């Protein structure tokens, strides 16, 4: 199960390196990013794999082809988003390739503070989905 984290990190890097057109992030987009991320965290907390999986972009679903496999990966490699003590939305930015990212400050189940960097991807139907998530521990900051 430990292979999931490197796979997810590689997926994140692959997504960043893909040629993507720059998005313009408006207030409605920011609100939608936060709704999606909060919805997925709520689904994780309820152990509702199908609901959590619905927020994932196709690139994630291609690597983790079922809600059960996806949830196993999240439980093993991303306890901070699977069972956060708390979370707050931080800045919404564009990554170097112009893709929108939503930063989330998380207090993990271990009491440590993390930044979750969510890369968002607009689908052909106009809906936003989570294309990647990278967790970075904030050293020296504990809850």
Please annotate each region the language model reported:
Residues 28-32:
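Short helix-capping and inter-helix turn/linker motifs at the boundaries of alpha-helical repeat units
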Residues 18-22:
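Sec/Tat signal peptide C-region and signal peptidase I cleavage site
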Residues 24, 34-35, 39, 49-99:
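Short solvent-exposed beta->alpha transition segments
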Residues 91-143:
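Exposed beta-sheet edge and beta->alpha loop/turn motif
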Residues 1-6:
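Positively charged n-region of N-terminal signal peptides that target proteins for export
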Residues 7-17:
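Bacterial N-terminal signal peptides
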């Amino acid at each position: 199960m430990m292979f999931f984290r490197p796979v997810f990190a590689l997926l994140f890097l692959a997504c960043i390196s893909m040629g993507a057109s720059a998005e313009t992030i408006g207030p409605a987009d920011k609100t939608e990013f936060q709704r999606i991320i909060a919805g997925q965290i709520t689904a994780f907390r309820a152990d509702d794999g199908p609901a959590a999986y619905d927020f994932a972009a196709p690139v994630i679903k291609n690597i983790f082809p079922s809600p059960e496999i996806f949830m196993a990966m999240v439980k093993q490699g991303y306890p901070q988003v699977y069972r956060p003590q708390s979370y707050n939305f931080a800045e919404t930015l564009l990554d170097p390739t112009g893709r929108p990212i939503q930063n989330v400050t998380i207090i993990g189940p271990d009491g440590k503070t993390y930044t979750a960097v969510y890369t968002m991807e607009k689908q052909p139907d106009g809906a936003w989905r989570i294309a990647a998530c990278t967790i970075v521990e904030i050293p020296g900051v504990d809850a």
